[in-house]
């Protein structure tokens, strides 16, 4: 999975927040986006490496990229399953 932050149409800074806050903020932000929009999430909570991919599967969004080797962790989430 290649990480391309330039795909993002929205950004969410979730650094300093701890579980469950990052995923709650992702859900709230995505709710206000259009299908096909891409959210860049920046977080430093280790639980996001598990929680954000699970959120995408459960809520039918696409995790189109992630960079979790260094802090902050970064995720690209496309709203909906259709590109």
UniProtKB/Swiss-Prot annotation:
State the GO CC annotations: cytoplasm
Q: Where would you say this protein principally sits, based on its record?
A: cytoplasm
Q: Which Pfam families match?
A: TusA
Q: Which UniProt keywords apply?
A: Cytoplasm
**Localized where?**
Cytoplasm
Q: Which domain of life is it from?
A: Bacteria
For the biological process aspect of GO, one term held by this record is: tRNA wobble position uridine thiolation
* Molecular function in Gene Ontology: sulfur carrier activity
Positions annotated as active site in the UniProt record: 19 (cysteine persulfide intermediate)
InterPro entries referenced in this protein's UniProt entry, alphabetically:
Sulphur_carrier_TusA (IPR022931), TusA-like (IPR001455), TusA-like_sf (IPR036868)
PROSITE patterns this protein is in?
A: UPF0033
The record's section on NCBIfam families has: PRK00299.1 (NF001423)
Give the protein's biological function. Answer: Sulfur carrier protein which probably makes part of a sulfur-relay system.
The entry assigns this protein to a family as follows: Belongs to the sulfur carrier protein TusA family.
User: HAMAP family from the entry?
Assistant: Thiourid_synth_A
- Can you name this protein? Sulfur carrier protein TusA
- Organism in which the protein naturally occurs: Vibrio atlanticus (strain LGP32) (Vibrio splendidus (strain Mel32))
């Amino acid at each position: 999975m290649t990480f391309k932050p330039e795909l993002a149409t929205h950004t969410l800074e979730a650094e300093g927040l701890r579980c469950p806050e990052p995923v709650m903020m992702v859900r709230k932000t995505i709710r206000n986006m259009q299908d096909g929009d891409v959210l860049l999430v920046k977080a430093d909570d280790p639980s996001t490496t598990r929680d954000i991919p699970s959120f995408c599967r459960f809520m039918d969004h696409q995790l189109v990229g992630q960079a979790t080797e260094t802090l902050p962790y970064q995720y690209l989430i496309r709203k909906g399953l259709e590109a």
